[in-house]
Amino acid sequence: MKSTVEKLSPTRVRINVEVPFTELEPDIDRAFKQLAKQIRLPGFRPGKAPRKLLEARVGRGAVLEQVVNDALPARYSEAVTAESLQPIGQPEIEVTKLEDNEELVFTAEVDVRPDIDLPDLGALKITVDPISVTDEDVDAEIEALQKRFGTLTGVDRAAEDGDFVSIDLSATVDGKDVPEANTEGLSHEVGSGQLIEGLDEAIIGLKADESKVFTTTLVAGEHAGQEAEVTVTVKSIKVRELPEVDDDFAQLASEFDTVEELRADLKEKISRFKRVQQAEAIRDKAIEVLLEQTEIPVPEAVVQAQVDDTLHNAIHGLDHDEDKFAESLKEQGSSREEFDADNRANAEKAIKTQLLMDSIADKLEIQVGQNDLTERLVLMSRQYGLEPQQLLQMLQQNNQLPAMFADVRRGLTVAAVVHGATVTDTDGAEIDTAEFFGPSGEQAEAEQDEAAPAEDATEETDADSDEAADDSK
């Protein structure tokens, strides 16, 4: 088999393949065996009919068509391997020549990973905001705990901002009742702004069993976007009483005995949360800087496929109704034009990022270990509420393991990029990235060197123990 490659663009090639008929003999034999099992000829047992009789029955052309269909995928893969190509997406294959007993010639056009001129990774500089945990941060968490363990007590007065009320609602549009907007005994925190616009203002000043009518725009249902007359009736008013922040409260709200211990724990949790946010900012900034410094051609067909997939997922829940989709976007303050523009921009950025990370991974020779895959599998199984083995079977059935492998490799690549970069905060302080990106190569080697003497000492101790045991026998 011979193959050549024509570069159509930085991201697309045409592979020309010539296959001598002698190399197709195994495929021809296989085709006749399949036909022999499918076709019954008088005087012959199933699967035992001679080639000539089978060929006479179905025709030589049908046999060759079956041979070509069976042979193309393997010959295409062989050509891709021989030419060291890295396809992304499915090929467009065309048979250009098929001469019996001579040769099969076909072409395959396919998008491929482009050659990317990478910047100097060692010169990469990443700057993010510094981390600080203030007393106000801790106070906010304490207040949240107070609210969680607070009690609601009824009051005999008009509703105020921050009160908790039970309300009945009804609405009309153009004088006609809107059944889906009617509700009774709805709990609501005054001032939260969680329901319809104008509700909080209407409630404030009302006492129990008092009502008020106000005008608002409905945001959901059949009458979404229409102006409605809404009647709100207050049924009860309660105020939240917060517990005093003392050691008893600490014991009620946590596993700690004192407020001091509780505050220290909250401070550490806030610090870790902010460190996680900072690590995410470092990752995003590293990718952002690399994308700015690198020219990355993207295959249009791959971009369009992702654009179509995102659109399909967005509109699928609306029964693919374009009008409903447009109305949904309007409710969110957007439009179809904005959605399409954002969708394409996001698709292009995502594909550029993948191509960039894959190229860097190749350059740095990033290897994915079994532990890396296991950690990702366990993490994903927790997110989906499945057993790891159950999730693994689902990924295998849906052929998603290669995608998971690629994603893990890209994550390891980002970590390697961060290790090689200079990472500081805006105050100029260098940031230790080991907590979330793992130790650098030098740090890992140093840790192994430190662990080695301890392991040797353990082995010597075990040997001494064995000798002592032998002596005692």
UniProtKB/Swiss-Prot annotation:
Do you know which InterPro entries this protein is assigned to?
PPIase_dom_sf, PPIase_FKBP_dom, Trig_fac, Trigger_fac_C, Trigger_fac_C_sf, Trigger_fac_ribosome-bd_bac, Trigger_fac_ribosome-bd_sf, Trigger_fact/SurA_dom_sf
**Main EC class of this protein?**
isomerase
GO terms (molecular function) for this protein are:
peptidyl-prolyl cis-trans isomerase activity; protein folding chaperone; ribosome binding
Keyword line: Cell cycle, Cell division, Chaperone, Cytoplasm, Isomerase, Rotamase
Where is this chain compositionally biased, Acidic residues type? 444-473
List locations, semicolon-separated. Cytoplasm
**What EC number(s) has UniProt assigned to this enzyme?**
5.2.1.8
Which GO terms are recorded in the biological process aspect for this UniProt protein? 'de novo' cotranslational protein folding; cell division; chaperone-mediated protein folding; protein transport; protein unfolding
What top-level branch of life does the organism fall under? Answer: Bacteria
- The set of disulfide-linked cysteines is none
Positions of region (Disordered): 433-473
Query: What SUPFAM superfamilies does its record include?
Result: FKBP-like (SSF54534), Triger factor/SurA peptide-binding domain-like (SSF109998), Trigger factor ribosome-binding domain (SSF102735)
Per the record, its GO cellular-component terms are: cytoplasm
Q: Name one Pfam family in it.
A: Trigger_N
**Chief localisation class:** cytoplasm
What PROSITE patterns does this protein's entry cite?
Answer: FKBP_PPIASE (PS50059)
**Reactions catalysed, as given in the entry:** [protein]-peptidylproline (omega=180) = [protein]-peptidylproline (omega=0)
Q: Where is the PPIase FKBP-type domain?
A: 162-243
Domain observations: Consists of 3 domains; the N-terminus binds the ribosome, the middle domain has PPIase activity, while the C-terminus has intrinsic chaperone activity on its own.
**Family label:** Belongs to the FKBP-type PPIase family. Tig subfamily.
Q: Entry's HAMAP family?
A: Trigger_factor_Tig
What does this chain do? Involved in protein export. Acts as a chaperone by maintaining the newly synthesized protein in an open conformation. Functions as a peptidyl-prolyl cis-trans isomerase.
Q: Which PANTHER family match?
A: TRIGGER FACTOR CHAPERONE AND PEPTIDYL-PROLYL CIS/TRANS ISOMERASE, TRIGGER FACTOR-LIKE PROTEIN TIG, CHLOROPLASTIC
What this protein is called in its record is: Trigger factor
Q: Which organism is it from?
A: Mycolicibacterium vanbaalenii (strain DSM 7251 / JCM 13017 / BCRC 16820 / KCTC 9966 / NRRL B-24157 / PYR-1) (Mycobacterium vanbaalenii)
